[in-house]
Amino acid sequence: MSEDAAVEETPVWLEVNGAPLVTWMCTPDLLEELALGWLHGEGYIDSVDDVRLRPCSTDLGFWATIPEAKLEAIRAENRRPVLASGCGAVATYLADPAGAPITRRPPVVLPPVEQLRQLFKTLFQLGTRYRDTGGIHAAALTDGATLLAHAEDIGRHNAVDKVIGSLVLNRRTIAGLGLLVTGRISAELAFKAARAGITWVATPSVPSTLAVEIARRNGMVLIGRAVSGTPALHGAAPAGAG
């Protein structure tokens, strides 16, 4: 029996303003992107200019310094620690979606079904770790025509943080883009996408009911069974619906 097919997993920690905040169990690549994407998706930063990120030279981890006002605003949300359904971060904090304000956005324009399938085909072709081992998740940000960033990780939320962080690092606009994921769309993933201004999220799998509620309240469309002939739309109504 060979060990070649084992998926690499390692802990990576993050401290913010001197306090331990999160530890990821993750695939150890694109770690700066992972940290930036997580901070952006959780509302700690709006851009790379909001943070000073220093890697530890003796361990896999980062020290981040952000404006204290940002940290106080997060604390004021009274987020509760939650054991999330996804793999990746050891701890996560979610606000109550039922209490979140409804975000009014223009109707979302979705790519045609065949174009969506082609985008996923490209993502799967880029999945070298998946081909080598299986048991890995992938994510990509797209403008509907091409993939702008992609990543693989043992945790699907980590893969999303990595692609968001890639655009944050390169000072590229995330709002208005679409997100491809290979696993189910959980509440945590929907929160991350909504905070980033992503307008639609697609998966070959399905979204959770709480993810659908988050999408509905934030004007976001979730696309389940995206590589099938008849994708299922959830959340906000896309342009041309009705």
Regions found by a protein language model. Give the residues of each.
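Intrinsically disordered, low-complexity regions enriched in acidic/Ser/Thr/Pro/Gln residues
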Residues: 1-143, 149-150
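Generic structural hydrophobic/aromatic packing signal, biased to beta-strands
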Residues: 14, 64, 87, 139, ...
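Surface-exposed beta-strand edges and their flanking turn/coil or helix-capping segments
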Residues: 27, 35-40, 76-80, 154, ...
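Short C-terminal domain-edge/linker segments immediately following a structured domain
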Residues: 44-46, 54, 94-98, 170-171, ...
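Histidine/lysine/aspartate-rich catalytic loop segments that bind and position anionic ligands
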Residues: 126-172, 178-179
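Feature captures the catalytic cores and cofactor-binding loops of soluble hydro-lyases/lyases
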Residues: 156-233
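Short, basic/aromatic-enriched C-terminal tail that caps enzymatic domains
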Residues: 230-242
